[in-house]
Amino acid sequence: MARDTISTWNRSQVDEDAMGAAHAPIWRRMIDVAAPTDLSRSTVLDYGCNQGGFLRLLYDRHPFRSAIGIDIARESVARAELLKGHRPIDYRLGDQAAALGQTFDLAFSHEVIYLLPDVAAHARDTKTALRPGGAYVAAMGCHTDSSLWPRWRALIAESSSIPIYDHSLEEVSKAFTETGFSVSVRPLALDAFMPFTIGSAYFPKVVDQLRYYSSDKVVFRFVRVP
């Protein structure tokens, strides 16, 4: 069931606009570990595209044939359209990939699954939108297996315009397996320096940040079984 649209995901416009730069090292790592080098004949979907930064980065590194990014945030999608330049990307309002009426070779999402009430429904929707053998790469650090989640849940709830949900890594794996995907997973294992802020609400200690980016944050690869 499609959800109502919103203006922006983050209630703070300043924080909303800052997300792209903050997420760029993570996106680069996702691309490094999960994106094929040659995407020249591939169609790509970005689920929860926000202001469109991931697909712009992906195209600049590995040009694809075409891509669609979907999101329920109206202002973010409009911003993504303004920023896409010459790239063959179409940003649209929505949260149902199947409603796009086409199939994709590759799909991505970054920190989207914890914002969805029904993981199994998301798996079914993704399956409809992927060609047989196509892959969905989903990065996820907001899950109940992370020791930081109780703290983060409260913090994110203060800024998110939509509800957040408690999903475990096992729950996500089970939902996609039962929907007809082969499931594999690895730690993101970020290989970049990340700024540390003394007194950070999200990372009280340096070791919290190190653990999060080395083990808590994972990258799933769901391949639609032919």
Please name every model-derived segment.
Residues 1-38, 41-50, 57, 137-159, 197:
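Conserved class I S-adenosyl-L-methionine
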